[in-house]
């Protein structure tokens, strides 16, 4: 998921959460919450997408990868982490 990916990339670069906080001007606690996918501080999906963008840029990720992470974030934030279920229309009796 989004948080796990960001954490793995950060650790692979030898960076701490504090390093990311300093590079993005986000609170370190928010960086931790993003990595744990604890989005209770995120007031709206647009803010979360912005946080993901800042974090991705701090890691040097390609814009395309950041866009994919933002999409994944939106899905999680909106509670749609599973594929939508298709409901069949009831057939009317003859």
For each of these PLM feature ranges, what is it?
Residues 39, 47, 60-64:
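Residues in soluble alpha-helical coiled-coils and helical-bundle/repeat scaffolds
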Residues 51, 55-56:
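Hydrophobic micro-packing sites on short alpha-helices
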Residues 1-8, 12, 16-19, 29, ...:
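Low-complexity alpha-helical segments at protein termini and membrane interfaces
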